[in-house]
């Protein structure tokens, strides 16, 4: 799978940043940063949130660069691959009750892309036990309007993954279309740091209450902000300063 993804990425180098990130990918320098998602009231860890990082200390997000659309898709698929490998490691090393289900942010468009369709099919066929502990956290806006394609995809994910989340941000125009696909959880990518941001959050808060969604507060930066999210009804949270992401690297990946 690793060699397949590297081969796919090399075909889609367009920008200088594409080349930079590809070189890191090829040399196994792209890692997952793992961050706890906690229960809002108890603080107990319920899930692990995984994003891609690279650099000497794994401090740089790969998505901070100017990447072509297809290279971003390749990285999304690579992120899913790393989640499968981490989950497989847990299955082999720990008792089933101790396994942490892992949340992977991924663009809907990456999974509707022809190579993404193939990758998902291979994942379900050959890595089903690991995929059962993965939670795709889907990112989309305009694509949500293509209800038939997205419905087919979400049905497949619900049947094979642990559960299905959707991400909602204040920048999204079509976030209410998420309701068409009955997500198990909503992950909010918003902040409450100033009056303008809190005002932008109101339509999303109304949307969540209307559909009685269980939701995760992301980007929580302080105890004060966490308390606000608790009052607003958040069931889970992540991003708090006490949970600095830890980079994970599996040097044996290139053997696959």
Residue spans for each PLM region:
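EAL-family c-di-GMP phosphodiesterase catalytic domain
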Residues: 1-29, 33-35, 41, 53-54, ...
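Bacterial c-di-GMP phosphodiesterase EAL domain
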Residues: 2-127
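EAL-type cyclic di-GMP phosphodiesterase domain
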Residues: 56-81, 108-114, 126-161, 190-207
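Short, well-ordered coil/turn segments that N-cap beta-strands
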Residues: 98-102, 129-134, 160-162, 184, ...
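Distinct, well-ordered alpha-helical segments
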Residues: 112-125, 145-153, 173-185, 229
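Sensor-1/coupling segment of RecA-like P-loop NTPase cores
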Residues: 161-171
């Amino acid at each position: 799978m690793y060699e397949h993804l590297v081969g796919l990425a090399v075909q889609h180098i367009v920008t200088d940043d594409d080349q930079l990130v590809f070189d890191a990918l090829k040399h196994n320098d792209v890692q997952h940063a793992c961050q706890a998602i906690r229960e809002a009231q108890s603080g107990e860890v319920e899930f692990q949130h995984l994003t891609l990082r690279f650099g000497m200390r794994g401090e740089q997000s790969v998505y901070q660069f100017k990447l072509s659309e297809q290279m971003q898709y390749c990285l999304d698929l690579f992120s899913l691959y790393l989640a499968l490998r981490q989950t497989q490691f847990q299955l082999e090393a720990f008792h089933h009750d101790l396994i942490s289900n892992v949340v992977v942010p991924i663009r809907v468009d990456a999974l509707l892309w022809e190579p993404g369709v193939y990758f998902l099919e291979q994942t379900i066929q050959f890595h089903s036990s690991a995929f059962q502990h993965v939670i795709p956290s889907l990112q989309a806006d305009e694509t949500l309007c293509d209800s038939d394609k997205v419905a087919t995809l979400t049905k497949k994910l619900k049947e094979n993954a642990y559960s299905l989340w959707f991400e909602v941000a204040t920048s999204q125009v079509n976030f209410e279309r998420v309701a068409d696909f009955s997500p198990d959880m909503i992950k909010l990518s918003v902040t409450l740091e100033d009056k303008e941001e809190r005002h932008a959050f109101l339509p999303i808060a109304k949307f969540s209450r209307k559909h009685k969604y269980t939701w995760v507060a992301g980007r929580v930066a302080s105890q004060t902000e966490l308390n606000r999210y608790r009052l607003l009804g958040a069931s889970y949270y992540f991003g708090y300063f006490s949970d600095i992401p830890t980079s994970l690297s599996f040097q044996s990946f290139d053997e696959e």
